[in-house]
């Protein structure tokens, strides 16, 4: 978020090349320059996690289970897409080769085009679907 704010909110695929491609030097410089804002976001995440754990413990103590779902697709303009472009079907300029949607059905005569980039399952398989394992493990631990 800090870099996105610094870039006036534009999508990461339109950032300067050194940031878009996550060049180590540029990312380290951004971390240094934006350290205060980064710490603010870390603090927000800490506060949310602390409050979530208290709420969940209270609900569980009262016999209430809290469940949620995990979105299957990531947004084009997401930290997941920026940090892991190799797991998605992008061209050399990070434009999606294909996007998610669904065909016409009872809810939409024209179908739906969601715009989420599709996964590159061959690339994900190379490390045993590590991104998915990490994502599901985090969600499981967060809910349990």
Across the structure, where does each feature detected by a protein language model lie?
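Alpha-amylase-like alpha-glycosidases and glucanotransferases acting on alpha-linked glucans and related
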Residues: 1-53, 73-144
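Anion (oxyanion) recognition and catalysis
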Residues: 60
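Hydrophobic faces of well-ordered beta-strands that scaffold small-molecule active sites
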Residues: 66-68
